[in-house]
Design a protein with these regions (language model features):
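Structured C-terminal subdomain patch of bacterial secreted/periplasmic proteins
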Residues: 257-322
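Alpha-helical, coiled-coil/dimerization segments enriched in small aliphatic residues
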Residues: 216-246
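Extracytoplasmic substrate-binding proteins
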Residues: 140, 146-212, 302, 306-322
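A short, structured surface patch at a secondary-structure boundary
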Residues: 72-122
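A local structural motif
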Residues: 57-63, 104-111, 232-243
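Short helix-initiation/N-cap motifs at beta->coil->alpha
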Residues: 53-55, 112-119, 242-251
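Bacterial Sec-exported substrate-binding components of ABC uptake systems
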Residues: 3-9, 19-73, 178-206, 268, ...
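Proline-aspartate-enriched helix->loop->beta-strand connector
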Residues: 120, 125-133, 149, 254, ...
Length: 322
């Protein structure tokens, strides 16, 4: 379980030769530039130009129809934009996440294997017309580009706002209207949810992952504005000194923060680890523990994406308004 927690925390911090086919969009890498994008603000027809994080200026002649993702954190965005990919890594893992279960039940994706070891042969068999990944796929960029044109996104700066990744991907695939509609839908949900949580304005909250007996992953305020921001999020209050960015803290540091409520990432084996903690005097003295205010949220609610944010918001509200 410790390995799972480390992977998920890394995700958040990160969150940081063409295959011929008659109906494929024609996409050419023209040159390199330091610009971020040449897309207009509103949805535009094709052809369109996009400049990715490597500085490649890519002209997309037609709207892509067979998209392959080589970074699994981006997959939920494709579902949100009503454009499920044909293939992605770690589909088996994602199928266990509560937020993605309904999407994966309705859409069959070819599993490309591990996020860190993409099955290139299987990807070739898929015959994508566009591959989307992140800068963490740069090591296999040359291999990927022999299969289909590649767009690499720098998701690290985008991960600080759940709206950014949908908007950025929408520029690539021509789904700006879908992105804005889904964003508006979630923004309205957050506004309604914030009103329901007004009785908790004087209480403090922490969002954690139990790494081991001595430390916790802590999900920072800047990384989770949907939970903490008073204008664009639920407006939950963190304890004084709560980290701005996602990282790790000791049990002793958690005791200093002493939140009234703790939302804990639910992963396999968490119940047993909590049982082991019951004998720890520091843990038992926490305000949240004494008050019975330690709650579980499925791990899929901590990945910062638009679907994860919606899932997390709904679960926080459901938990606190039972």
């Amino acid at each position: 379980m410790k390995r799972i927690v480390v992977i998920l925390l890394s995700l958040v911090i990160v969150t940081g030769g063409l295959v011929g086919c008659s109906n494929q969009p024609k996409i050419n890498i023209v040159s390199k530039s330091s610009d971020s994008s040449e897309m207009p603000g509103k949805e535009a027809a094709f052809p369109r130009t996009y400049i990715d994080s490597k500085g490649n200026k890519i002209i997309i002649e037609k709207q892509p129809q067979r998209l392959a993702m080589v970074a699994f954190p981006l997959v939920e965005t494709m579902f949100a934009l009503n454009t499920p990919p044909v293939a992605a890594p770690q589909v088996t893992v994602m199928s266990q996440w509560d937020s993605l279960k309904p999407y994966l039940a309705a859409n069959s994706l070819i599993d490309l294997g591990s996020q860190t070891s993409i099955n290139l042969e299987k990807l070739l068999d898929v015959g994508p017309d566009l591959i989307i990944g992140t800068r963490y796929n740069e090591e296999i960029y040359d291999e990927l580009s022999k299969i289909a044109p590649v767009v690499l996104l720098d998701t690290q700066p985008l991960s600080l706002d759940w709206r950014s990744v949908p908007r950025e991907i929408a520029k690539v695939i021509g789904k700006e209207q879908d992105a804005e509609a889904r964003i508006a839908q979630l923004e309205w949900l957050i506004v309604q949810s914030r009103d329901k949580l007004l009785p908790y304005q004087e209480e403090t909250f922490a969002f954690l992952a139990l790494a081991d007996k001595g430390s916790f992953g802590v999900f920072g305020k800047q990384n989770y504005p949907a939970f903490f921001d008073g204008q664009s999020g639920l407006g939950l209050h963190a304890p004084n000194g709560y980290p701005e960015r996602t990282g790790r803290i000791s049990l002793e540091r958690l005791a200093e923060l002493n939140p009234d409520h703790i939302f804990l990432m639910k992963v396999a084996g968490i119940e047993k680890k909590l049982e082991d903690l019951k004998g720890n005097s520091i843990w038992s003295a926490l305000q949240a523990v004494k008050g019975g205010h330690v709650y579980f949220v499925d791990r899929s609610g901590f990945t910062v994406g638009i679907v994860a944010t919606e899932y997390g918001v709904k679960n926080v509200v459901k938990t606190l308004t039972k």
